[in-house]
A protein has these predicted regions:
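A "functional boundary" signal
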Residues: 26-195
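Bacterial N-terminal signal peptides that target proteins for export
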Residues: 2-13
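Bacterial N-terminal signal peptides
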Residues: 11-22
């Protein structure tokens, strides 16, 4: 009977240890995931491409882990802002083919979801990827598409303000001076309305 009691006590102790370890591990994993999501959302909210807390490789990994959840919850604006961040991370580490490929897949997904904001952000991502690959003319076309779509989406003025400076600079570099004037005026108007 003593052996049974010792064995039973030992089993109970093992279960308590296992539950404790599981709880600690689950808490640590949840806490880590929360920190990752928080770091990515900080980047999106502050229009940053990376930070000390979220270097390029981490952005790619965490973003790919978080994207299915955002898609499932139909958080399309945040989903495509996150995917834009992933494209930028690929480009920042010099992987232009991956950046362009990811941006194109992003565009296809946005079309399949029939998400205007997703299509606009995907067009922007394609423009950014092309610009980073020194392909200015295709970048210009992608930026134009993004801006045309964003014009039709209420509340997207901040996104337009983020695109316009590099778009205008690209127009200047490629000698599209008539368009520069048009988009400079647009930028001034947007900035006056949303300082």
């Amino acid at each position: 009977k003593t052996t049974f009691t010792v064995g039973k006590s030992f089993n109970i102790a093992l279960i308590v240890i296992a539950v404790t370890l599981y709880s600690v591990t689950t808490y640590a994993a949840d806490n880590k995931a929360t920190r990752h999501v928080s770091a990515l959302l900080d980047l999106i909210d502050n229009s940053l491409n990376y930070s000390k807390e979220a270097p390029n490789d981490s952005i790619i990994q965490w973003g790919n882990e978080l994207a299915p959840l955002l898609k499932k919850q139909k958080e399309y604006k945040t989903l495509f802002q996150l995917k834009q961040l992933i494209v930028t991370a690929y480009a920042s580490r010099g992987d232009m083919n991956m950046a362009i490929d990811h941006a194109r897949r992003m565009y296809k997904e946005a079309k399949e979801l029939n998400s205007p904001i997703g299509i606009a952000l995907s067009s922007r991502a394609i423009g950014d990827a092309y610009l980073n690959a020194n392909m200015q003319e295709p970048a210009i076309e992608s930026y134009k598409e993004a801006l045309e779509l964003l014009d039709k989406i209420p509340g997207s003025e901040i996104l337009e303000q983020e695109i316009l400076p590099k778009f205008i600079l690209t127009l200047i570099q490629t000698s599209h001076m008539d368009e520069v004037r048009i988009y400079l005026q647009k930028f001034e108007n947007l900035y006056a309305d949303n300082p």
